[in-house]
Design a protein with these regions (language model features):
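Transmembrane beta-strands of outer-membrane beta-barrel proteins
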Residues: 48-54, 105-107, 123, 137-139, ...
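C-terminal beta-barrel architecture of Gram-negative outer-membrane proteins
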Residues: 160, 298-398, 413-414
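Short loop/turn motifs that connect adjacent beta-strands in outer-membrane beta-barrel proteins
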Residues: 41-48, 99-103, 134, 215-216, ...
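Surface-exposed extracellular loop regions of Gram-negative outer-membrane beta-barrel proteins
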Residues: 50-54, 82-132, 202, 356-358
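Surface-exposed, low-complexity loop segments enriched in small/polar and acidic residues
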Residues: 1-88, 146-199, 220-283, 318, ...
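Hydrophobic, lipid-facing positions within transmembrane beta-strands of outer-membrane proteins
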Residues: 28-34, 89-95, 121-127, 193, ...
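C-terminal beta-signal and adjacent terminal beta-strands/loops
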Residues: 218, 310-311, 358-371, 397-451
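Transmembrane beta-strands of outer-membrane beta-barrel pores
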Residues: 40, 56-62, 109-115, 141-147, ...
Length: 451
């Protein structure tokens, strides 16, 4: 089809630009494990229990785009190759120690050894104290890790363009980088995986209480705190340019041969990847309340689960790559402070109905992205993305053995997600795809059989 004229392309032209593509991808996972558990000895509160185990895993991925992609004959569709494999051993041990009738301790540790990034040991300790019937206090502390994915390790190279001024080259040519003579151009960024990535590490702590005054009511409140470091992220463009493009010889910034008398050649491409950089920490409070009672011959349940994010801080490189800067993202784009789920369920004999209210609080829209690729949270106070509430309804029938029939309506009131400008990249449709469901009223039927 010719969008600039009133005629159609002939079939011979369409055939010349049409092709068939074959993309081959495989992923394999092989795992062996063994576990043992049982009692050890008696304590004041009961028998001390232990569980232990070992596991061996092999995993690999291979993604091969069509040869036409690899030769650059297809334009406008991403096709990135990936190939990586690894194996790992792990072992764990856990002890449950009922020190008193009212006090239980849990001790655990896990060791992992990966063929690509090394080994890590992570302990965990938790305690539960019930001084009165129906009243319990709990706390836990532990560390964790996340291994880099095989895609992050073995992702093949892909290309994208970045429009900017090569200010270092302009200065080398004797031009003022702020003048019109120093013109911005499209340059190629080559992105690939990093086989030298390390695991992300974390530390978490929580403390809380649960109260069940009777068979009808149950309440709980928990404070949680999570810290992560060695976060895997893409290297921002500004850091790469400022750190590596002011010299002629660099594995990151690739330049052509300088002209006689020049120090720098024309910029050809910049190589980018994933790296272990930055830290983030978050803490908040979870509150729940549940009510159960016999109503109108059936069983009524009402439950509220509320979460309040008190703080979400992220430390990452500044544009120059000289230091880590801390940003508080609480209430910023995709980080709402408040969320809750309110559920009501009533069952009578083989019939039941359920209503669920889902609420996501408001947050700031995305601030402008500067030349360095860093979100300008401090100086740019953008508009607010409103809160979003949806209602889901469902009726069910369980009169057949092992079979549940359900008819439901998601987003029964046909609410639209609040408008968002977004980041101009992944959110191009006027809503925040990572937080809000754009689907309107959705009617469904479902049959579930368990055996």
């Amino acid at each position: 089809y010719n969008p600039f004229g009133a005629t159609y392309n002939p079939q011979s032209v369409i055939d010349a630009i049409t092709t068939s593509l074959v993309r081959q991808g495989t992923a394999t996972l092989t795992a062996y494990d063994a576990q043992i558990s049982g009692g050890l000895f008696d304590l004041a509160g009961g028998a001390a229990m232990m569980a232990a185990g070992v596991e061996y895993r092999e995993e690999s991925i291979k993604d091969i785009p069509d040869d036409q992609f690899q030769r650059g004959l297809i334009f406008g569709t991403e096709a990135v190759s990936a190939q990586a494999s690894r194996d790992n051993w792990s072992a764990f041990v856990e002890f449950s120690l009922p020190v008193l009738d009212s006090l239980e301790l849990n001790l655990a540790a896990r060791y992992d050894d990966y063929s690509d990034f090394g080994n890590t040991t992570n302990p965990k300790i938790s305690a539960r104290w019930e001084p009165l019937d129906g009243l319990a206090f709990r706390a836990s502390w532990g560390t964790g890790f996340r291994a880099p994915s095989l895609a992050q390790v073995g992702l093949g190279p892909s290309q994208e363009s970045q429009f900017f001024k090569d200010t270092y080259y302009c200065i080398d040519q004797g031009l003022d980088p702020n003048s019109l003579n120093c013109t911005p151009l499209d340059y190629t960024i080559v992105f690939a995986g990093n086989p030298n990535l390390k695991a992300e590490e974390s530390e978490n702590f929580n403390v809380g209480a649960a109260w069940k005054p009777n068979d009808m009511w149950q309440f709980s409140v928990d404070y949680w705190d999570i810290k992560q470091d060695k976060k895997i992220d893409e290297v921002n463009f500004g850091f790469l340019y400022n750190q590596f493009c002011n010299v002629q010889t660099s594995d990151v910034c690739v330049r052509g041969t300088p002209l006689p008398g020049d120090t720098l050649g024309e910029l050809q491409s910049i190589n980018s990847s994933f790296i272990n950089i930055g830290e983030q920490s978050t803490n908040g409070v979870d509150v729940s309340a549940y009510f159960r009672s016999a109503v109108m011959g059936g069983e009524l349940f009402v439950g509220l689960d509320y979460s309040r994010m008190l703080e979400f801080k992220k430390r990452e490189l500044n544009a120059a790559g000289t230091s880590l800067v801390s940003r508080d993202l609480t209430g910023e784009y995709e980080y709402p402070e408040d969320r809750f789920v309110l559920t009501g369920d009533w069952g009578f004999a083989d019939w039941g109905v359920r209503a669920t209210v889902n609420y996501t609080g408001s947050f700031e829209d995305t601030p402008d992205i500067d030349f360095d690729g860093v979100l300008d949270y401090d100086t740019n106070k953008s508009r607010t993305v409103g809160s979003f509430t949806t209602l889901n309804l469902q009726a069910r029938y369980t009169g057949f053995e092992g079979l549940t029939l359900a008819l439901g309506i998601d987003n029964a009131l046909d609410e639209e997600p609040p408008f968002a400008i977004g980041d101009g990249d992944t959110d191009l449709y006027g809503y925040v795809s990572g937080m809000h469901d754009p689907r309107g009223q959705f009617i469904y039927g479902k049959a579930t059989y368990r055996f």
